[in-house]
Amino acid sequence: MLAIFSGRDILMCMNKRNYQKELDREIESLEEGQVPSLFLHSCCAPCSSYVLEYLSRYFSITVFYYNPNIYPAAEYHARVEEQKRFIKELPAEHPISFLEGDYIPQEFYDCARGMEHLPEGGERCFACYRLRLEKAVREAKKRGYDYFATTLSISPLKNAEKLNEIGEELAASYGVRWLPNDFKKRNGYKRSTELSREYGLYRQDYCGCIYSWKERHPETL
């Protein structure tokens, strides 16, 4: 049976933004010899692997590790150490530094309140995107960075359109440029798995929060 598409469906497909091409244009617009600063929120070392390999050719990067959603605390600390190890071991054309945000799980629980029952990938996740990106842009603004972004879009399970929508909204509010991205494009996710094997990175089997953990491990309930 042939699928039937409405004019609205076709128009939406035609108007769908290609964030990778937008990133290409942003990089191409940089003046020769210019190395702008990027405040990059990272969710974990594996997701940051390809992103850092790619963007460190063009930017001086600070990896901002702010993830109060991660459960339990032992998992959080394991991911922090893996992130720091990867940054130390990765050869990069331009400097990559590390900054850890406060780990206060209650900040995540507050933003997720009333959405605990929702499935992964919906409004609760969008609220979590916003929580982490707003913390990132505030720090980027305070520290005088040229751009901010997140590694989250590399995951096939993360909504790149929503991430860019939130990023652009925050950029307009705080006056720090958002670096458009969909890092899973051009085999970015595939490259991240290759780098994870190459560096022996710990790859967790759930996003990080207690709700995703319960979905992945129902036998523990």
Locate the predicted segments by residue.
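Nucleotide-activated chemistry modules centered on ATP-dependent adenylation/adenylyltransferase
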Residues: 2, 6-50, 58-221
